Regions:
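C-terminal non-catalytic regions of proteins with extracellular/luminal or membrane-system context
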Residues: 1-432
C-alpha cells in the first residue's frame, strides 16, 4: 500500500494561499517587534534620499534561532533584498544565537569586532547620519559607540525577524510601519553590571555547574533595586510619535486589583501604539524584595495623533506575594505597596498606595528539589528601607490615594505534587 505521509513539506513550487497569508502575518508581526532604541530625527527615511548600505549582516540576515528554534521555510528575504531599490543608508550587524549556539563574550559576538568598529568609525568621520541595525537575538555591547560616535543618529534592535524580516525592516525604516516593540531584557552598560555575569560555566571552563545567586534580583529587578543605571531599560522602546500616560483610576476589591491607564498620542504626524506597564513595590521586611516588579502590561490600539485610549490592566493578587522558603508558601505580607505606571522600568510614576493590614497565605507548595546546600543569594539592596520611606514622602507631597487591599486566601489548599507519593527525590530521578 502506498505510504501517504512521506514528505513533511510541500512539493508545489508555487506558494499556496495559506503560505501567502502567513507571510503577510509574519511581516506584520516582525515589524511590530522591532525596537527603536535611538532616533535623532533621521527616521523614518525619505525613500528617495541617496544613502549607502554597509555591514555583512545586510546580505546574511539571521532569520531565527538554531536547534529547536530553527524552522524550515520556502525562502527568506534579507535586508539587502528589500532595500536595494529604496536607497537606504544603514549599517547592519548580525549575530547567530540559539540552541547549541550560545552567545560568546568576545569580539564579533557580545562585543563588536575590530572590523565593525573600524567601519563605524569611518562612517562617523564622514559626517553622514549613521543608522545602526542590530540583527541579534540579544544585547550587543554599545556603550563605547554611544559615548564616542557623534553621528550615530538611530539604532533599531531587530532581533530575529523570520522569513519576511527584510520587508519588515523596510516597512519601519520608510515609515510604512511605526515602531512599537519593547525590550524584554535590560541592556547593561558593562557586561559585569549583570549580577550573574560570571556564573556561566562556559566562562570558567567548567560547564558542569552554574550557580545563580541573583535570587529575586533577576534582570531589571537588580538594576532597579541596586541603583545600577542600564544602557537601555527593560520595557524600553521609542516610536515615531510620542505618548503621554497617566493613571486614570484603580478598582480595588477583596482579592482583586485593576488599574486604568490613559494613553494619549501627543504627536502630530504618526499614528502608533504604546504599551502601558504597571509595576508594584512591596514592603521591605524579613525577606529581600525587589524595588519594583512588573505586574501587568497592555498595548493600545493604533492611536491617531491626539487620540486617547484608556486601558484596564487586571493585576492578580499573587503579584503582591513573596515566596517564603521556610513556609514553602506564597504570602502577601502586611505593609505598604506602591502602584507605579509608565512605559519602561526606568520611566515610572508612583500613582497610588495599597495598604495590607494582615499577612495572607495564598498558596502552599511542596518542594520536590530542595537545595542540597546553601546558595548564598543576594541580600536586600542597600537603601531599600529608605526607598520605602520615600514612598510615604511622595504620598504626602503629591497627595496620593491610599487603598485598603484585602488578599483572599483560596478556599482549599493547593494539591500535593502527585510524584511525591512515589518517594523522595533520589528515588524519583530514574523516572524522569
Amino acid at each position: 500500500m502506498e505510504q501517504p505521509f512521506t514528505h513533511s513539506g510541500t512539493r508545489d513550487p508555487a506558494p499556496s494561499p495559506r503560505e501567502q497569508e502567513n507571510a503577510a502575518l509574519a511581516r506584520q508581526a516582525a515589524a511590530a517587534g522591532i525596537v527603536l532604541l535611538k532616533n535623532r530625527g533621521v527616521l523614518p527615511l525619505n525613500p528617495g534620499a541617496p544613502v549607502a548600505l554597509f555591514g555583512a549582516g545586510a546580505g546574511r540576515t539571521v532569520k531565527g534561532g538554531t536547534g529547536s528554534g530553527d524552522v524550515n521555510n520556502r525562502a527568506s528575504v534579507s535586508i539587502w533584498q528589500d532595500l536595494k531599490g529604496a536607497k537606504a543608508a544603514l549599517y547592519v550587524i548580525s549575530r547567530i544565537a540559539g540552541e547549541g549556539k550560545d552567545r560568546r563574550l568576545e569580539p564579533g559576538d557580545y562585543y563588536l569586532s575590530d572590523a565593525e568598529r573600524a567601519d563605524l568609525q569611518t562612517l562617523d568621520e564622514s559626517g553622514l547620519p549613521v543608522v545602526l541595525l542590530l540583527n541579534a537575538g540579544g544585547p550587543v555591547e554599545l556603550t563605547g559607540l554611544l559615548d564616542g560616535m557623534q553621528h550615530l543618529d538611530a539604532i533599531l534592535q531587530l532581533s530575529q525577524l523570520g522569513q519576511q524580516g527584510g520587508q519588515a525592516v523596510a516597512d519601519v525604516l520608510l515609515g510604512r510601519a511605526v515602531p512599537e516593540g519593547k525590550l524584554t531584557a535590560t541592556w547593561a552598560r558593562r557586561y559585569d553590571d549583570i549580577p550573574c555575569a560570571r556564573a556561566f560555566g562556559s566562562l570558567k571552563g567548567d560547564v558542569s555547574q552554574d550557580t545563580y545567586r541573583d535570587g529575586v534580583y533577576v534582570g531589571y529587578r537588580y538594576f532597579d533595586s541596586f541603583g545600577v543605571r542600564p544602557l537601555f531599560a527593560f520595557g524600553f522602546g521609542l516610536s515615531y510619535t510620542t505618548f503621554a500616560l497617566r493613571a486614570a483610576g484603580l478598582d480595588v476589591q477583596p482579592g482583586h486589583l485593576a488599574v486604568q491607564v490613559e494613553v494619549a498620542n501627543t504627536g502630530a504626524r504618526f499614528a502608533g501604539r504604546e504599551v502601558a506597564q504597571v509595576y508594584l513595590s512591596a514592603p521591605q521586611g524579613e525577606l529581600p524584595r525587589e524595588r519594583r516588579r512588573l505586574a501587568g502590561f497592555a498595548k493600545t490600539r493604533r492611536l491617531a495623533p491626539g487620540e486617547t485610549q484608556t486601558l484596564t490592566l487586571e493585576i492578580p493578587q499573587k503579584q503582591l506575594a513573596a515566596f517564603h522558603p521556610e513556609q514553602n508558601a506564597w504570602v502577601v505580607d502586611a505593609g505598604l505597596y506602591g502602584v507605579w505606571v509608565g512605559n519602561s522600568s526606568d520611566a515610572l510614576r508612583l500613582c497610588a498606595m495599597l495598604e495590607v493590614d494582615a499577612a495572607v497565605t495564598l498558596e502552599r507548595t511542596h518542594p520536590i528539589c530542595p537545595p542540597q546546600h546553601p546558595i548564598g543569594e543576594l541580600g536586600a539592596a542597600p537603601g531599600a528601607q529608605d526607598r520605602e520611606a520615600d514612598q510615604w514622602r511622595q504620598k504626602v507631597e503629591y497627595d496620593l490615594p491610599v487603598y485598603k487591599f484585602v488578599p483572599v486566601a483560596p478556599a482549599a489548599p493547593a494539591p500535593a505534587a502527585p510524584l511525591l507519593a512515589e518517594g523522595d527525590l533520589d528515588s524519583l530521578v530514574p523516572l524522569l
